[in-house]
Amino acid sequence: GDVYKRQGETYDWDACRAVMEKHNDEVRNEQEKWNFMATPYTAAALTVPNLFHTFYYAFSGGRNPEIMKAERKVMKILEQAYESKTNCFPKTRYRAITWGGPPCYWLQFPNWLYNCWGILVIAGMDLFSGNVLIDTTDEDTMLDGIARNYETGVMRRHLTGGWQHLVEFWDEAEKFHCDMVILHDDITCKGALGLTGVILDQAKEKKTKLMMVSNDMFDHRTVSRADIRQQVNDYMYSVMQAEPLDASLLQYDDYEGW
C-alpha cells in the first residue's frame, strides 16, 4: 500500500498472471523435451540444450515470445528423430550427465568428450533450474510459486542449497539412462565442499561411473582446457580401460583460444 502511494502506481496482477501462465507453457515444453532426450534417439545433446536453457529459457520466464517459437521448431526435430528411430549420435559409447559449475571458458567441452571419447552428454545441471510450474490461482499462490522457482536456481539449489541439492544427479542420471556422471569440481564456487567425500562414498555403491573434473569456471589460466582434457584422458585410460575414438584430439594447443 505505502509503495503504491509513493509511486503512484498499482501492481498489475493480471499482467503477472499472464506472464506466469506463459512461463508454465515453457516449463511443460521443457519437460516434454526431456522425455525425448531420455531415449536412444534424441536429437538434443552436447552443448546446445544447456546453452539454450541457461541463456534464453532461464531469462525469459514467460516474457520472451521468441522462446516458444524456437521451442516448437526444436520439438519437431525431436519428434522426427524419435519417430524414425534415427541414431543422431552414432559414435556414442557412454551416456553422461554433468553436474556442478562447468568451465565457462570451454563451452565446447561436451563436443570434445563426444568426438574424442564417445561420451554423449545428454544433460547438464543447468538444465534442471527454473522448471517449477506456478499456481496462478491468486496473488499468494503466484508469489509462492515464484519463490519456489527461485529456489531451484543454479547457484541456490545445485551448489549451496539447503537440502539434498548436489546428490540429485544420481536420480537424474537414472532418468536419462546415463551410465556416467561427470562432476565439475569448480574451484571458483569451492566445488562440492564437504560433500565430495559423501559423493565418492555413494559412487562406490552405484553402477553409474563418476568422473570428477576440476575447472576454474571463468579463468583458464588456473585450470586450462588442456588440464581438463588430461583429467578426462587419465580417467578414461586408467578407470574405464578405454581407447579414444580419435587420438589426435587427446591434446592440442588452445591456450590462447578466447
Model-based region annotation:
Residues M37-N115, T137:
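Aromatic-residue-lined binding/catalytic grooves and analogous aromatic/hydrophobic interfacial grooves
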